[in-house]
């Protein structure tokens, strides 16, 4: 039973209060009534999980890109957005290794990884392995391939050549959407 990294380490009651607060929009008194806890306990839980919520806005990004100079540029852009690079994978095997060993909150992936390897297939395998849906942005010279291949569950597509501001915006939008769902 795998837990999303943002929720990892929290007790069940902490998760319940956090999710009811963020997703349900319930206030402290309502949370106490719903959970059967005292208002002071709810207040204490919220104070304890606030660092988790703050950490959710900064995440590890896995870059899957077969061109080293492009991977390096993407890593600089990721760091400029305030996130950290969990790994740079040039191949499917490297991507799987990073995914299994690192906390990943976002994937930036090319579609054509060379040697007939499709980035969408790698991302799908990572999601299966981790047991949850990692937000993904495809940065590709072939955005039409996503439609042709029926690639769903993507959080953004940035066509190459790209504007650096568009990449930054896509990264922040995907991370903040994910944080609002899980934090």
Predicted regions and their residues:
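A short pre-motif secondary-structure segment
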Residues: 17-18
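Helix-turn-helix DNA-binding module
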Residues: 24-45, 49
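C-terminal output helix
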Residues: 30, 162-172
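Conserved acidic segment of CheY-like receiver
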Residues: 58-69, 74-78
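Acidic, metal-coordinating helix/loop segments flanking the phosphotransfer/catalytic sites
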Residues: 88-106, 147
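Active-site residues of response regulator receiver
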Residues: 110-112
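Short amphipathic alpha-helix used as the core "switch/output" element in two-component signaling
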Residues: 118-133
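Hydrophobic/aromatic residues positioned on beta-strands within the core alpha/beta folds
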Residues: 137-140
């Amino acid at each position: 039973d795998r837990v999303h990294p943002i929720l990892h380490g929290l007790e069940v009651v902490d998760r319940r209060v956090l999710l009811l607060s963020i997703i349900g929009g319930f206030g402290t008194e309502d949370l106490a009534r719903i959970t059967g806890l005292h208002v002071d306990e709810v207040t204490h839980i919220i104070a304890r999980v606030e660092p988790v919520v703050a950490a959710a806005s900064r995440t590890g990004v896995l870059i899957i890109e077969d061109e080293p100079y492009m991977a390096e540029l993407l890593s600089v852009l990721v760091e400029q957005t305030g996130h950290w690079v969990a790994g740079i994978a040039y191949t499917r095997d490297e991507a799987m290794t990073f995914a299994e060993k690192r906390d990943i909150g976002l994937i930036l992936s090319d579609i054509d990884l060379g040697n007939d390897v499709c980035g969408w297939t790698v991302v799908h395998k990572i999601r299966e392995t981790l047991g949850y849906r990692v937000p993904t942005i495809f940065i590709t010279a072939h955005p039409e391939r996503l439609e042709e291949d029926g690639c769903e569950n993507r959080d953004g597509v940035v066509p190459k050549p790209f504007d650096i501001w568009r990449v930054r915006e896509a990264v922040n939008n995907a991370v903040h959407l994910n944080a609002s769902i899980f934090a």
